[in-house]
């Protein structure tokens, strides 16, 4: 059975997709058969691999909203690298909550829609990575009901600290529905060497300590370099061979994070 991991925060722009695709890249490079499921209507997982999500007709939305589509779930799975597949999201996911909540007869178990998809494919993979939208609605509930581990990206700023607290609270509430759910790590992202950032990092570390939640030693620095290379080469940095001396430290951060999580040795 696959280990199912979500990168989740109700704040946007904190590198959820970058973490998702690069952690998946590390796992794939270590011969771990991995699937990325995109649950965000922006479709950034697909674009990370040079694909236009609007060119893909059969997506996670179809698998979530049409039980018959699960019979051909393999048609929604796209191979993007050795040991690495993805299921794409696009703008259709923007209508997911409205479509489901306005049709309760068709979706009586509306918290279980993603879990149903995961159960269909989990025997084929060692890891399933889920990229999430910056919201705490029905999509987040489906994600929390389907995963074991949640990794929370934390940008050390005022609004992000508030978001961290609320995300942890939402996960704690959902433990009744999913006893296997846990916050596996909080990962600092977009970190700069300023007193303000260090103050918010210290505050976040102190808060997570009170919640018995790990706070990562791996910091994702505030830089555009690896984002630019991903965009130029249409592949996450952890899947790029022969990176430059400038980019090698960023690749190593993701490698160390996956080791810290205990997913590889």
Say what each PLM segment does:
Residues 1-265:
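P-loop NTP-binding core
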């Amino acid at each position: 059975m696959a280990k199912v991991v979500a990168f989740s925060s109700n704040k946007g722009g904190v590198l959820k997709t970058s973490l998702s695709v690069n952690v998946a890249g590390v796992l794939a490079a270590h011969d771990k058969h991995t699937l990325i499921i995109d649950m965000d209507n922006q479709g950034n997982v697909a674009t990370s691999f040079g694909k236009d999500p609007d060119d893909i007709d059969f997506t996670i939305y179809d698998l979530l909203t049409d039980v018959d589509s699960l019979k051909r779930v393999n048609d929604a799975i796209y191979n993007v690298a050795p040991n690495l597949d993805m299921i794409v999201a696009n703008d259709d996911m923007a209508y997911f909550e409205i479509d489901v909540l306005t049709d309760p007869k068709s979706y009586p178990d509306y918290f279980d829609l993603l879990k149903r998809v995961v159960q269909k494919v989990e025997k084929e993979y060692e890891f399933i990575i889920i990229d999430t939208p910056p919201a705490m609605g029905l999509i987040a509930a489906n994600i929390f009901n389907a995963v074991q581990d949640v990794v929370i990206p934390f940008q050390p700023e005022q609004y992000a600290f508030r978001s961290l607290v609320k995300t942890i609270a939402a996960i704690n509430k959902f433990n009744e529905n999913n006893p296997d759910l846990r916050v596996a790590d909080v990962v600092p992202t977009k970190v700069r060497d300023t007193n303000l950032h260090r103050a918010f990092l210290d505050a976040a570390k102190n808060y997570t300590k009170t919640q018995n939640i790990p706070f990562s030693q791996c910091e994702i620095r505030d830089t555009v370099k690896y984002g630019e290379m991903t965009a130029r080469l249409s592949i996450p940095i952890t899947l790029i061979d022969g990176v430059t001396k400038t980019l090698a430290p960023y690749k190593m951060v993701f490698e160390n994070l996956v080791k810290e999580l205990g997913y590889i040795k």
